[in-house]
């Protein structure tokens, strides 16, 4: 016999969800003001409300914008909610703005947390299973066919290069094709960090030239896990410290990807990236301002 859910527990969960949505909306509005954003006051929905709805979709509805729009309207959180096609157009129009807001949060965390240790790694996001590559309509390029060594399987999609604080809050990210190795992505990240920062990464980021350049020009130390044949071997205790510090980023990846649906539905490649960015931004806001 299946027991009915506790009404008090349902009410508590609902209240917590509403509080997180309201906090996200307030945080988004404050961030937009901080970057001096202005918009047309004649619009039915503000950019902050559009972005908050996308964040709500990522946090609670597996990225389903239609479900999030209905929830926001039904609970009178966004009474002037746009219909589906208009909402999607507005959301695509603010995609760069979402990116700017993420980096604004990253800058705040870098400057205010006093953090000097950061974690760097990548995780794959498939657009489809490898056997269905020929049916993909979002993009067609062999550059997006990558390999997941831990699972010993190929995938077709992108890699997210993610830089987080030591406590696991994302501060920088970049999207790369699935086949891109980590050294290539290292050169794509801005790594706009305070002098004296240390970035912990696995052995796939081994690039002595980039390592020396960062140390000399930016005073940033790249703490890479050394391979057995490395020219710059670590002492055993240094290797242990690096491993214990960088291991936490795997937990961050799990926390972000657990919000994903089984497959991310998108009509265009830009729409796919926008949804992934919303998942990352939602996780960042929750870690930085809500929890």
Regions from the language model: what does each represent?
Residues 1-291:
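Short alpha-helical elements
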